[in-house]
């Protein structure tokens, strides 16, 4: 339906430019973790999507009911769902609450301290530790990993991940998490509904007078001491214009993620992450799930 970058006639969109730069590809994630559909905007397509995501993920949609399926100008629909639910190799300790990035509020944390069991160490792979302000670890699941990169950089996620990869390749220190090392990570919840209204109502270049009627995205993310759950949906309705409106023992390292950091989710056998997040203000990510 739409091939290549989305550009508008007589309208410059910074949001569209940023989205066009994103390089997410299906090859970054296994087929059993996503579902996509597109076609003419009919109730039959809606039923097809609802049945498919229920059978594949046992999930319902948060966006399909926001599409006008009876509007005759609603020509096409593009839809995608990403679903991930995985546990770490071992359950982490629940740590005392403390501040994040000099906040007034205290937040819940999990990780590894001096009382933790040695078997928990294998759930953490050290990517690099250059100094107390520049380090990264990967929490291990069976097929996925959570990469945490301590940095204040405001670069794009693509450039952040490139920096992280270079530092990981150059690191010659101990990649094992060992006795004396400590780990501290905040519990995180994100539930976000985004309506990209700035993309709507403008004629799309190189089409037969089509425009975006709705562009919706939802994210439901939870990370705790046992694992990660992620559900994300995206839907875009395309309308016609007719009715347009190991080493010797070393000093212990503190991998404390209690200040600004970047988070990536990646399948172990893939080279690029399928999800990224920058955590700076914990009030936006305050954990709302249960703690066991």
Where are these regions (language model features)?
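Hydrophobic-core positions in well-structured secondary-structure elements of globular domains
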Residues: 1-292
